Amino acid sequence: MSNAPATTSNAPVTIYSTPVCPYCVRAKQLLTRKGVAYDDIDLSSQPPAARAELMARTKQRTVPQIFVKGTFVGGFDQLYALEQRGELDKMLAG
């Protein structure tokens, strides 16, 4: 993703979000409760080309867009489902 905003930290989770998105807030709350470090990239402060490239890469037009260890998992509903099935911890450990 040449134009998409990137992160240089070692956080296992990256969330592409906007400040007014309730699902973005819920995803961050879930990760915070679990003690999982994450990078939060605010798409509202990024150039339109960055958002367009991210949307093209993931085929999703909504936020949040969540990556765990570089793997796109989807939005909040998918993150929550992974947590409920016990799969999120496995992804984070792997």
What are the functions of these language-model segments?
Residues 43-61, 90-94:
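Thioredoxin-like thiol-disulfide oxidoreductase module
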Residues 68-94:
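Non-catalytic, surface beta->alpha helical segment in thiol-disulfide oxidoreductase systems
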Residues 55-75:
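Short, structured active-site "lid" loops
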Residues 2-41:
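Local sequence-structure signature of Cys/Sec-based thiol-disulfide redox active-site neighborhoods
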